[in-house]
Curated annotation (Swiss-Prot):
GO molecular function, one term: identical protein binding
Protein name: Major vault protein
Role according to the record: Required for normal vault structure. Vaults are multi-subunit structures that may act as scaffolds for proteins involved in signal transduction. Vaults may also play a role in nucleo-cytoplasmic transport. Down-regulates IFNG-mediated STAT1 signaling and subsequent activation of JAK. Down-regulates SRC activity and signaling through MAP kinases.
Organism: Homo sapiens (Human)
Subunit (UniProt): The vault ribonucleoprotein particle is a huge (400 A x 670 A) cage structure of 12.9 MDa. It consists of a dimer of half-vaults, with each half-vault comprising 39 identical major vault protein (MVP) chains, PARP4 and one or more vault RNAs (vRNAs). Interacts with TEP1. Interacts with PTEN and activated MAPK1. The phosphorylated protein interacts with the SH2 domains of PTPN11 and SRC. Interacts with APEX1. May interact with ZNF540.
Expression by tissue: Present in most normal tissues. Higher expression observed in epithelial cells with secretory and excretory functions, as well as in cells chronically exposed to xenobiotics, such as bronchial cells and cells lining the intestine. Overexpressed in many multidrug-resistant cancer cells.
Name of the gene this protein is made from: MVP
Listed GO biological process terms: cell population proliferation; ERBB signaling pathway; mRNA transport; negative regulation of epidermal growth factor receptor signaling pathway; negative regulation of protein autophosphorylation; negative regulation of protein tyrosine kinase activity; protein activation cascade; protein transport
MVP repeats (start-end): 2-56, 57-111, 112-164, 165-217, 218-272, 273-323, 324-379, 380-457, 458-520
Length: 893
């Protein structure tokens, strides 16, 4: 900063620059000094300290002044200092010096760089020069300044980087690469890009043209590991063996304990040792031959005990395998891959490629490279009732082996027997055909069933009193097995599956079964019938049945059992047809009276031989069972479980009649129970009163005794005149007590007489009331019977008055009119409704006459008097029945 002062005091080791404005030349004034500024001069800045370079330091000055040989500063003709423009000067430790005008302190005071041991400076020449030894250095040359030492910088030299030595430890190597052609520290010539390893332990300082790639660790080898290497190029390894590019080899602990991979070696991995025990073996694929090359496509079997390393290119087939140790019940199925001979001397056996043979234990077997183990076979233990299916692969025949332990030969395999899905499901259910026959088919087991072993002989336990039919499709014949028995299927045999009807009413194919139960058993069916007067009823019938087999050893006789696949549905349909035909010829009233006899006669029929009656007329005798000759089914009895009207109005009328009878019976029983309760209450009350009187009598007796004792005591205590007075008083008390006792007895007798009289009176009253109530009920029943009879007669007369033809005309008038209307429209077909919408002629007559639903055909039964089949009125319900007659009461649900 310029100053305007005229007197400037310059301290020691300071300086200023003075500009002569006339000549425009600057000069240096150095202190200590007092400088008087002239008018034509200008001080450019205040006094400034000189540049002091301490020892072991340096600074860089740009545009330095020129000096002569003696070191004096040179000036030009104008008095201006002569500068070396665009040049640099490095000044080391010296006396303090000022900066002349034009000089610039480019780099401030800087300590000299100390190069430590194992360290070097990478230097590069910027200009040509000669070093202190007189050697010429060309710009671009590079070299190292290695420590220890202090580096004195030069303006012609640039410090590129600081290089640190790399420490090489045991089992390590330094990988280097030449940046250009050079000589390494061992005196070997290296070309550009060449790589090599330095294995000398210690600190290694790379040369100027050596590039450190990485520090390579040695691979420690043990007896159980080997190093897998591959050559990157042709070279000689550390053992002096020539390696070609791509060649692979192993280095084991026998070669070296620690191996440092060379720069021309590629580490593919560490190979573990393969150890075989005394019962192990392995198959090596593509084994290495004596020439060290892999024999492609070859195999070698190695048996333990042995340890080895897999050579490059070798691999194990299925790893380490166990030697086959076979017992007496084991064997091996072998196949020859190549022609070979087995055995020794005379026992040699030749096998061609593809041959199969079986060896049996006990022995230890190691398959050779020419033999393939197809499978290991185990003898199959079979119980007396167990078996397997075996197929000969040469002939194709299948047979069943049952009851003994068996091992398949080389030409045999297990054969799987397929069963129809229905049979498979029935076998897997595991249900007892007899005990579980009532369970529904929809009740499935929650736990999944284990799949059947298809190679095992299919067996089925036939329960007692049952039969199973098995059909042989090869022999084209069937056999029937009766239980209890265990039936086993041959290779070509199948079960005959029964598809039975079930439910109420019976539904076809609702239940499937393998065995046929021979009975006795029962099944129930619901059928709908229609009487001659068009009354529709629903019957629930139960039939007891069984199968009759005269000779179980006769094949034709036993085959009849399975001639009808659905004997339940067939029998129910046949019986229902007979019942419908029999009921269709009788009226509702007759059927209601004799339902059991009619149904039994319809089901069983009559004997063919007719007996003669007393008057010489033929009397057919009813049968006691129905026989179906197709399959020998016998229906031994019929149970009519329920009879229900299908028509709602008929059902309501019957229900009201039954309710009325129930109410009458209930009221009668209620009155009798009430009378009995009152009688028991009167008896209990009389006994209670009698007990009270007896208790009072006993109390009086005790009081009498007490008074006697008191009197006696008074008599003992008193003497003289007091004795007489006491005796008189005691006598009076005795007389009074006897009077009280007598009075109590009389009262008790009077009360008993009154109670007995009252009881007799009440009993007479109750008997009269019961007679009166019974008479009233009989009058009401008689009235109801007479009304029903009148209604029946009225309905009968109306029906007779109208006539059957008129009723028929009324019934078909509507459909005929509809048919004519359809014909007028040109239609050629007529729709006939099914049984769900029948023509009810029974109610049509009442509708035509304008009568209500009260006109039910009940009068006929009343008019005919109480009968054994009557189930509506109370009198008929209590009437005795004839022997052998069945009484059927309609059940309303």
């Amino acid at each position: 900063m310029a100053t305007e002062e005229f007197i400037i005091r310059i301290p020691p080791y300071h300086y200023i620059h003075v500009l002569d404005q006339n000549s425009n030349v600057s000069r240096v004034e150095v202190g200590p000094k007092t400088y008087i500024r002239q008018d034509n001069e200008r001080v450019l800045f205040a006094p400034m300290r000189m540049v002091t370079v301490p020892p072991r330091h340096y600074c860089t000055v740009a545009n330095p002044v020129s000096r002569d040989a003696q070191g004096l500063v040179l000036f030009d003709v104008t008095g201006q200092v002569r500068l070396r423009h665009a040049d640099l000067e490095i000044r080391l430790a010296q006396d303090p010096f000022p900066l002349y005008p034009g000089e610039v302190l480019e780099k401030d005071i800087t300590p000299l760089q100390v190069v430590l041991p194992n360290t070097a400076l990478h230097l590069k020449a910027l200009l040509d020069f000669e070093d202190k030894d007189g050697d010429k250095v060309v710009a671009g040359d590079e070299w190292l300044f290695e420590g220890p030492g202090t580096y004195i910088p030069r303006k012609e030299v640039e410090v590129v980087e600081i290089i640190q030595a790399t420490i090489i430890r045991q089992n390590q190597a330094l990988r280097l690469r030449a940046r250009k052609e050079c000589w390494d520290r061992d005196g070997k010539e290296r070309v550009t890009g060449e790589e090599w390893l330095v294995t000398t332990v210690g600190a290694y300082l790379p040369a100027v043209f050596e590039e450190v790639l990485d520090l390579v660790d040695a691979v420690i080898l043990t007896e159980k590991t080997a190093l897998h290497l591959r050559a990157r190029r042709n070279f000689r390894d550390f053992r002096g063996v020539s390696r070609r590019t791509g060649e692979e080899w192993l280095v084991t602990v026998q070669d070296t304990e620690a191996h440092v991979p060379d720069v021309h070696e590629e580490v593919l991995g560490v190979v573990p040792i393969t150890t075989l025990g005394p019962h192990n073996y392995c198959v090596i694929l593509d084994p290495v031959g004596p020439d060290g090359k892999n024999q492609l496509g070859q195999k070698r079997v190695v048996k333990g005990e042995k340890s080895f390393f897999l050579q490059p290119g070798e691999q194990l087939e299925q790893g380490i395998q166990d030697v086959y140790v076979l017992s007496e019940q084991q064997g091996l199925l072998l196949r020859a891959l190549q022609p070979l001979e087995e055995g020794e001397d005379e026992e040699k056996v030749s096998h061609q490629a593809g041959d199969h043979w079986l060896i049996r234990g006990p022995l230890e077997y190691v398959p050779s490279a020419k033999v393939e183990v197809v499978e290991e076979r185990q003898a199959i233990p079979l119980d007396e009732n167990e078996g397997i299916y075996v197929q000969d692969v040469k002939t194709g025949k299948v047979r069943a082996v049952i009851g003994s332990t068996y091992m398949l030969t080389q030409d045999e395999v297990l054969w799987e027997k397929e069963l129809p899905p229905g049979v498979e499901e029935l076998l897997n259910k595991g249900q007892d055909p007899l005990a579980d026959r009532g369970e529904k088919d929809t009740a499935k087991s929650l736990q999944p069933l284990a799949p059947r072993n298809k190679t095992r002989v299919v067996s089925y336990r036939v329960p007692h009193n049952a039969a199973v039919q098995v059909y042989d499709y090869r022999e084209k014949r069937a056999r029937v097995v009766f239980g209890p028995e265990l039936v086993s299927l041959g290779p070509e045999e199948q079960f005959t599956v029964l598809s039975l009807s079930a439910g109420r009413p019976k539904r076809p194919h609702a239940r499937r079964a393998l065995c046929l139960l021979l009975g006795p058993d029962f099944f129930t069916d619901v059928i709908t019938i229609e009487t001659a007067d068009h009354a529709r009823l629903q019957l629930q019938l139960a039939y007891n049945w069984h199968f009759e087999v005269n000779d179980r050893k006769d094949p034709q006789e036993t085959a009849k059992l399975f001639s009808v696949p659905d004997f339940v549905g067939d029998a129910c349909k046949a019986i229902a047809s007979r019942v419908r035909g029999a009921v269709a010829s009788v009226t509702f009233d007759d059927f209601h009276k004799n339902s059991a006899r009619i149904i039994r006669t319809a089901v069983f029929g009559f004997e063919t031989s007719e007996a003669k009656g007393p008057d010489g007329m033929a009397l057919p005798r009813p049968r006691d069972q129905a026989v179906f000759p197709q399959n020998g089914l016998v229906v031994s009895s019929v149970d009519v479980q329920s009879v229900e009207p299908v028509d709602q109005r008929t059902r309501d009328a019957l229900q009201r009649s039954v309710q009325l009878a129930i109410e009458i019976t209930t009221n009668s029983q209620e009155a009798a129970a009430k009378h009995e309760a009152q009688r028991l209450e009167q008896e209990a009350r009389g006994r209670l009163e009698r007990q009270k009187i007896l208790d009072q009598s006993e109390a009086e007796k005790a009081r009498k005794e007490l008074l006697e004792l008191e009197a006696l005591s008074m008599a003992v205590e008193s003497t003289g005149t007091a004795k007489a007075e006491a005796e008189s008083r005691a006598e009076a008390a005795r007389i009074e007590g006897e009077g009280s006792v007598l009075q109590a007895k009389l009262k008790a007798q009077a009360l008993a007489i009154e109670t007995e009289a009252e009881l007799q009176r009440v009993q007479k009253v109750r008997e009269l009331e019961l007679v009166y109530a019974r008479a009233q009920l009989e009058l009401e029943v008689s009235k109801a019977q007479q009304l029903a009879e009148v209604e029946v007669k009225k309905f009968k007369q109306m029906t007779e008055a109208i006539g059957p033809s008129t009723i028929r005309d009324l019934a078909v008038a509507g459909p005929e009119m509809q048919v004519k209307l359809l014909q007028s429209l040109g239609l050629k077909s007529t729709l006939i409704t099914d049984g769900s919408t029948p023509i009810n002629l029974f109610n049509t007559a009442f509708g035509l006459l304008g009568m209500g639903p009260e006109g039910q055909p009940l009068g006929r039964r009343v008019a005919s008097g109480p009968s054994p089949g009557e189930g509506i009125s109370p009198q008929s319900a209590q009437a005795p029945q004839a022997p052998g007659d069945n009484h059927v009461v309609p059940v309303l649900r």
